[in-house]
């Protein structure tokens, strides 16, 4: 089975087993769900903004509106056509559907300097070319705008560089946000992948509780570096070290 088919089957199973959760109440909730407060803060006092969610899966959960800002949310995913077929199959009507496209092709899809905020969660390190993808994210961001990225630390190494997990993003021992991969030597500072004209606005490294499949949980038990296996109230809890960073485009 291909990775893409496996991914589609995963969502088909979720939709089948949680069908009621994705019907009218969910659609109404999505329509009125506000953009997260920390992202609204990045947008400042602008009256109207355009926001892009990259690698969103079949349903972007970013938040479709802000009470104080005229907000246009768009979403893109490399499997969007298959996801939209799946949404049609189940009859889901959602406020924002993803369009088909790879992160490396953002400029062709949307044009340069098109968005006030670009959001990318758990997908930069899943791209075919993380360096080109990051450059494209910056290119489609307006001067003065922000690129918000969230990844699990060293996903490539934790997954033995299998399938889509070809890249490692991590903070080096000397505190530098770094990009690497199995066949990439030496590893490089992540912002070196981008032309001049940007700066690291914010960075945070913390533990989170991801949704892990059985294989990931087994790796966690075996003590892979970026997964931690703990016991809480008698229940096993897996946490992952997450890196969240924001790049500001000068302007």
Residue ranges of predicted features:
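C-terminal lobe and adjacent flexible extensions of AdoMet/dcAdoMet transferase-like proteins
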Residues: 227-251
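A short glycine-rich, Lys/Arg-flanked "PGG" loop and its adjoining helix->strand segment in the class I
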Residues: 131-146
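Class I SAM-dependent methyltransferase SAM/SAH-binding core
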Residues: 52-106
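Conserved class I S-adenosyl-L-methionine
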Residues: 148-177
């Amino acid at each position: 089975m291909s990775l893409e088919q496996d991914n589609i089957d995963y969502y088909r199973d979720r939709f089948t087993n949680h069908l009621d959760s994705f019907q009218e109440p969910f659609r109404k909730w999505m329509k009125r769900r506000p953009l997260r407060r920390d992202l609204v803060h990045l947008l400042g006092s602008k009256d109207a903004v355009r926001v892009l969610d990259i690698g969103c899966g079949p349903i972007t959960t970013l938040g479709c509106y802000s009470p104080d800002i005229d907000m246009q949310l768009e979403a893109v995913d490399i499997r969007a056509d298959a996801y939209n077929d799946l949404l049609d199959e189940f009859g889901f009507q959602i406020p924002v559907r993803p369009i088909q496209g790879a992160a490396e092709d953002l400029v062709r899809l949307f044009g340069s300097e098109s968005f006030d905020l670009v959001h990318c969660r758990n997908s930069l390190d899943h791209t075919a070319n993380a360096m080109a993808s990051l450059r494209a994210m910056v290119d489609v961001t307006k001067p003065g705008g922000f690129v918000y990225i969230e990844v699990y630390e060293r996903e490539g190494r934790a997954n033995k560089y299998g399938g889509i997990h070809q890249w490692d993003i991590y903070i080096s021992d000397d505190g530098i946000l770094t990009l690497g991969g199995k066949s990439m030597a030496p590893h490089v500072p992540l912002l070196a992948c981008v032309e001049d004209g940007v700066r690291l606005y914010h960075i945070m490294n913390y533990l989170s509780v991801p949704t892990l499949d059985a294989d990931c949980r087994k790796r966690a038990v075996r003590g892979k570096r970026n997964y931690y296996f703990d016991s809480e109230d008698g229940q096993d809890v897996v946490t992952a070290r997450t890196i969240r960073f924001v790049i500001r485009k000068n302007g």
